[in-house]
Amino acid sequence: MSRGKIRFAALISAMFVLFINICAFAKVDIPNHTDRFFINDYANVIDSETEDYIFEKGKAYNANGGPQVVVLTMESIDGNDLEDFSIETARKWGIGDKDADNGVLILLVMDSRDIRIEVGYGLEGVLNDGKCGRFIRNATDSLSAG
């Protein structure tokens, strides 16, 4: 192997190691949940009556053994990956029963107009990607219509 090829291979290897280390230490900045765990309107887009409704429904559903369904609105997630942000939020906040893994996070990001529904593995048979996709499409259509 020529010196040029060895140097090139060494450079590529060093860049690969650097990239892996940067990715491994990339931190997603997750806010703390509010005292009203089921509704976290950091974008200030939900009126107080609707917040109260979501909170009371979430509390009652959880008290009756149902999964925890949490709503989070953010103005921005500062360039973070939507999926990574939602997964890390669900983990940090401990959404759902740990053993049943039955939490649901509904995330709305205002600046990018993204909606994501993060579903714990314990609910994927009931709330699969297809159902979540239809819900998001219907919600998007309703929001667009005003």
Per-region residue spans from a language model:
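Bacterial N-terminal signal peptides that target proteins for export
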Residues: 1-12
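Bacterial N-terminal signal peptides
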Residues: 10-21
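Folded, non-transmembrane soluble domains that reside on the lumenal/extracytoplasmic side of membranes
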Residues: 25-146
